[in-house]
A protein has these predicted regions:
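C-terminal catalytic histidine-bearing segment of alpha/beta-hydrolase fold enzymes
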Residues: 25-27, 204-232
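Catalytic nucleophile-loop/oxyanion-hole region of alpha/beta-hydrolase
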Residues: 51-60, 71-107, 232
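N-terminal cap/lid segment of alpha/beta-hydrolase-fold proteins
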Residues: 4-37, 82, 152, 181
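Short beta-strand/loop motif that positions the catalytic acidic residue
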Residues: 183, 188-191, 195
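Short beta-strand element of the alpha/beta-hydrolase
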Residues: 35-45
């Protein structure tokens, strides 16, 4: 399929060589006109790698073809420093809003999309980020939400927390259903009931927390589909 979007690639931290892996890919909608909404896309990969195609670039092409400025985030792996992925996501949100005029986007309509562990990062951005870097809406595909051992995806938890995996304070901090507050954005959750990788309870817990805080939320659980379907 021919999409016809213009794509730009940028270093996220151009003045920090040690953070050179972090990049964003900006897909512009084919048609100009009024300022467009935007989405920051966080691929999954268990905080060990990144599914850049079906949970990144393929998504961006679709969203851009539907009128969004779509930004794929190639975030760094934690490698023992649990703050790294969220710092990259916050920086990306700042860059997007800071380029609103240049990229012809509406700085008040910047959402986040995340899949699996990328959904955990997107939900972290929605609940833990500084106010100025929080998204205006979130779309989470089969996200990791809780770090409770009975609910979580063990690989994502291990790779993010590393040696601090038994630190109760950090486990609670990254159990994001516990971090929802009145500033958490409206959220759409999409998942499969037969997901054997990330238990559907993760999304249910987050949806329940959003509902308790009277934040608009929708959850769509398909009867089959498994995990990691992205835009395949």
């Amino acid at each position: 399929m021919v999409w016809g979007q213009q794509v730009e690639q940028f270093k996220l931290w151009p003045d920090k060589p040690e953070a050179g892996e972090a990049e964003i890919f900006v897909y512009h909608p084919a048609k100009g006109g009024k300022a467009a909404p935007a989405v920051l896309i966080c691929p999954g990969g268990g905080y060990r790698g990144l599914a850049m195609n079906h949970e990144g670039h393929d998504m961006a092409k679709w969203y851009a073809s539907n009128g969004f400025v779509a930004v794929v985030l190639k975030y760094r792996m934690p490698e023992g420093v649990h703050t790294i992925p969220l710092s990259d996501a916050e920086k990306a949100m700042s860059v997007i809003r800071g380029n609103a005029a240049k990229w012809n986007l509406d700085a008040n309509k910047v959402g986040v999309i995340g899949s699996s562990a990328g959904g955990h990062l997107a939900a972290s951005l929605s609940t833990l980020a500084a106010d100025a870097n929080r998204p205006d809406f979130a779309i989470l595909y089969y996200p990791v939400i809780s770090f409770d051992n009975m609910t979580t995806h063990g690989g994502s938890k291990k790779n993010l927390l590393g040696k601090d995996i038994e630190n109760k304070e950090l486990v609670d901090r990254y159990s994001l259903q516990k971090q929802v507050d009145d500033k958490t954005p409206k959220t759409l959750l999409l998942l499969s009931d037969d997901d054997q990788t990330v238990p559907p309870l993760n999304s249910i817990l987050y949806y329940t927390a959003l509902n308790e805080h009277h934040i608009p939320a929708s959850l769509y659980m398909f009867p089959s589909g498994g995990h990691g379907w992205g835009f395949r």
